[in-house]
């Protein structure tokens, strides 16, 4: 059995389904990790994985995800939550005006094992759209 430490329990099901194919049972452990900021996904993931492992006392999984806009390579990346909160829908519309709306949603899954980060990456290509309530 392996734990996924997350403050967002709906993230559990897709990971549990994938790991079940490998005969690995996954359990969710709700845990609030600090919101780490860095321009590098792996730097954020490594710090989160180490903190989670230390808090739980055993290796466990953590994730980090973000949006990558083709018009702005590498942006916003791991800073997606901060950028969306700061700019809002209208700011994102202005940012993308006249540029490509192609984007990738990137998700990393990581585990801190014996002082080393093990990680996996998945991507979903899409077109960025701004939705208004």
Feature roles, as predicted:
Residues 2-3, 10-133:
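Anionic-ligand binding patches
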